[in-house]
Amino acid sequence: NRNAFRGSRFNAPFRYRTFNNGVSIRSSYYAPRYRVNNYQNYRLPQPGRYQTYVRHYNDVLLVNTRTGRVVQAYRGFYW
């Protein structure tokens, strides 16, 4: 169901930036307000320990919250 991936308007206090796997990002990028807590609805794999999904504009990032590193980037996830 394509509408499951339709995102609402996304506003962030920072500009869009493409993140690659393995890069470190600031904790403000994975603050609680940007977390995707209902990852099952989007058919995303269960995050591992100390990992969380966050929305960055139309992308979803799987981030290790202890290190700030991007584990997996899903670009263009929302439309």
Where are the predicted features?
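Low-complexity segments
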Residues: 1-79
